[in-house]
Amino acid sequence: MNPRLLEYYNQELQHIRESAAEFAEEFPKIAGRLSLSGFECADPYVERLLEGFAYLTARVQLKLDAEYPTFTHNLLEIAYPHYLAPTPSMTVVQLRPDPNEGALSSGFSIERGASLRGQLGPDDQTACEYRTAHPVTLWPLEVAQADYFGNPAAVLGRLAASEPRAKAGLRIRLRSGAGIPFDSLSLDALPLYLHGADEQPYRLYEQLLGNACAVFVRAPDNAWVERLPTSSLRARGFDDEDALLPVVPRAFQGYRLLQEYFALPARFLFVEFSGLNRALRRCHGEELELVVLFGKHDQRLEGTVDAEQLVPFCTPAINLFPRRCDRIHLSDRVNEHHVIVDRTRPLDFEVHSLQQVSGHGSGPEQPFQPFYAVRDPARYGREQAYFRVRREPRVLSSKQRRKGPRSTYVGSETFVALVDANQAPYRHDLRQLGIAALCTNRDLPLFMPIGAHKSDFTLEDSAPVMQVRCLAGPSRPRASRAHDASAWRLISQLSLNYLSLAERGQGAAALRELLRLYGDSGDPALQLQIEGLREVSSKPCTRRLPMPGPIVFGRGLEITLDFDENAFRGTGVFLLGAVFERFLARYVSINSFTETVLRTGERGEVMRWQAKPGSRPNL
């Protein structure tokens, strides 16, 4: 039972008793019949009558309050449906290849969406299921050595002299396995995950993507050197095809980037070396080196970088997977139906979103479309059959209230209603309802025995993988915030646009309010980062647009983000700046651009990203 019912009941009863005194004074004759003479009522039957009335009005008040989230949910269902769903647990894993199994010389591809099963805990019955976000190609190679140095001339000699701006460098030695020379590999791109403790991987990420001025591939004995353009070194994880959360076409994808960042910042710590094939054809041995020179030197990285911090064959993964829920038996006496993934283990699964709803009876299958989806009679026919979804925080059982839940994350429950075009109950002769949904394992990722076994996960598909190791996470799942007072704050961002960001004195406040919607309010470190955004300013500018074809100039916005670096101890400010750079580029329309500048009070201008054309359509 909702605990607010008792609160409303006491309020209504107090109001009746207080107003009874005024009523008795104004109308003593009528009040005398009801035995009302003041705050107390002498007649016990009238007292019971007043208490019953207070109970009924309290229930009416609850029903009125229930219409408030219904309105906000309906609005968010149209514009940003991902706000209504919980944020699943996320992780970063390495798929370590088995050199003794399969032919890896031509590469073995593991596509995006591969299923990973976690190990069972001592009291668990259900294994957590994760799905990968990046495609991974396995090769017979390893990172044998890596070192960061601050004097390129002393380490690299003439190679460093070819780049006078170089003040530091990173050397990565790759070694092939099973006696296979590099020129027999068709490898062209090599993604690496930056692994490590505390702030170190974030500092290395800033050096690689913010300060790289030259990239070389060479033989260890310097017998040959191949220079690559700096554009061959790029970030991974920001594109829609690398997304962890579902990509909703009608929603702005910049919000998804923020949601993933605040759930697990390490999911963006990926860099990729591309265009390697030409250099590899020159390497007839089993070792080669990737050398990156930097225009700035970070002294804290010198002597601390090793091969364990540059990990190949990695991918982010999310505890989100498709599953058919148990059939629902329909009844005319019930308007809403509880969606249960598995009745034998109801607490081990949570519905993230519904993908397909269909009714089953004596006749043909009846498909139901989302009520707020685009309606196309030519495609779905003229049968007005829709479903509407409602999500509520899970109510603890009496046993859980006595002994406590198994974790602090309780999760939510999903209810579906069958309606017609007017949201009236759908009249039917169906007997069962079949539902396909995206599901999570609720709070089970919190109990996974990470590091207790040789492999933290098992790859469901057959592949030459001997170990799946968890490198970051699993992160804590988060409940939807559309049920509390932040629902209106979610709706308020509908009015946020690049003009509000450009408004002097208002841009920082608008972005901080936006970040509070995604950051965990119970995490002091994240809240400190949000407050670390001190100022946002913008000015119009004209730049040459970076696009193929003839030279084209365009008008856009130079947006400067000013941060307090002391608020980002442990993670650094560069990664959040990179997320914002992609966010702002997606925010502006085509035929315009943004040029994002990252500044801190401690270091001044940290990074000026290249002008990036907008990707938002005008219509």
UniProtKB/Swiss-Prot annotation:
A Pfam family matched in the record: T6SS_TssF
Organism domain of life: Bacteria
UniProt-listed InterPro entries: T6SS_TssF
Physiological role: Core component of the H1 type VI (H1-T6SS) secretion system that plays a role in the release of toxins targeting both eukaryotic and prokaryotic species.
Subunit and interaction comment: Interacts with TssA1.
Protein name: Type VI secretion system component TssF1
Lineage per the UniProt record: Bacteria, Pseudomonadati, Pseudomonadota, Gammaproteobacteria, Pseudomonadales
